[in-house]
């Protein structure tokens, strides 16, 4: 699943990503990603100082990105794209301790970012006429987490994309993000397709759960998945109190109830985590989950690259004809 929201308040964003708030950094340091990050010499772990600088529209050398003429866009310091693994994948990865599955999720996020960069656009004036230039680079920081707000196992990555990109003339400018958000459905499909291919290469079987390409691991049933969906049950109870089932509720009602019932994301110490994992393992045994699913041989790097390309092609093939034509024309 892919969700996203804009980061519009610089002061609030600074506290949101600080060690004090500890929302993104508490489960491990983030890593720099994207061709734009490479152009700025940003590699490896994310450091808080540079992270805040970039959110504020300043380059590592102190230069400030020129303000955009769009007042609304000027308030956007970046965007948080959150890629969440299917629940059964989270259960296999985090309770069984399957590092290969965790790595598959990370590679699928990278594939999605590579596709996002194809939609990176900046404004440029030529002879007094403003036009859009496809830049092909983004500056992003990826923070991988393992918990839902309800403390269920939930493997997900916050991909924070900064509001900047380098044009062909070497100048850094704010993003013109219309195409990026126009293709979020494609990005989510590409992530799911890549993840499915990587998991199949590991020997896991999957089952599709809808026509949009959502899937779960075949050896973990829906009933077993529900054992690790506390927040989902809270939402169901809230709907019952309103006299509705989930099927009858509108999307807005579901979103409002989800927000209203979302518990605070508290910090967890090492001991808390050990207790939590022990609890998960006990629940998985009670649910009858068998983690020792047979797996085939792991593919090499070349197979991974081919799987990534095939996954994106698969996602594109399932879009509308208009979207596919737009992508092919780039």
Task: Annotate the PLM regions.
Residues 1-314, 319-323, 327-329:
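Intrinsically disordered, flexible peripheral segments
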């Amino acid at each position: 699943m892919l969700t996203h929201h804009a980061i519009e308040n610089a002061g609030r964003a600074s506290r949101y990503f600080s060690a004090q708030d500890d929302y993104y950094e508490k489960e491990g340091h983030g890593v720099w990603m994207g061709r734009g990050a490479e152009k700025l010499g940003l590699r490896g772990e994310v450091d808080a100082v540079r992270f805040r600088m970039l959110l504020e529209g300043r380059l590592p050398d102190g230069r400030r990105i020129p303000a955009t003429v769009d007042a609304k866009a000027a308030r956007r310091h970046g965007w948080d794209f959150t890629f969440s693994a299917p629940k059964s994948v989270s259960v296999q990865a985090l309770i069984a301790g399957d590092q290969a599955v965790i790595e598959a999720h990370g590679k699928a996020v990278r594939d999605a970012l590579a596709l996002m960069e194809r939609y990176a656009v900046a404004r440029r004036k030529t002879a007094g006429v403003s036009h859009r230039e496809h830049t092909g680079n983004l500056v992003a920081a990826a923070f991988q987490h393992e918990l839902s707000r309800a403390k269920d196992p939930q493997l997900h990555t916050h991909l924070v994309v900064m509001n900047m990109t380098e044009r062909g003339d070497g100048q850094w400018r704010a993003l013109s993000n219309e195409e990026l958000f126009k293709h979020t459905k494609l990005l989510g499909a590409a992530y799911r397709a890549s993840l499915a291919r990587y998991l199949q290469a590991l020997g896991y079987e999957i089952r599709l759960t809808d026509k949009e390409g959502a899937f779960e691991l075949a050896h973990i049933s829906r009933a077993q998945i529900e054992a690790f969906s506390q927040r989902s049950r809270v939402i169901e109870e809230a709907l019952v109190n309103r006299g509705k089932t989930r099927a009858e509720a509108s999307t807005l009602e579901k979103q409002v109830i989800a927000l209203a019932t979302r518990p605070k994301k508290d910090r967890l110490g090492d001991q808390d985590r050990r207790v939590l994992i022990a609890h998960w393992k006990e629940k998985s045994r009670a649910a009858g989950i068998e983690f020792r699913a047979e797996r085939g041989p792991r593919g090499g790097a070349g197979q991974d690259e081919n799987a990534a390309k095939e996954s994106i092609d698969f996602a594109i093939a399932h879009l509308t004809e208009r979207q596919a034509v737009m992508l092919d024309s780039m």
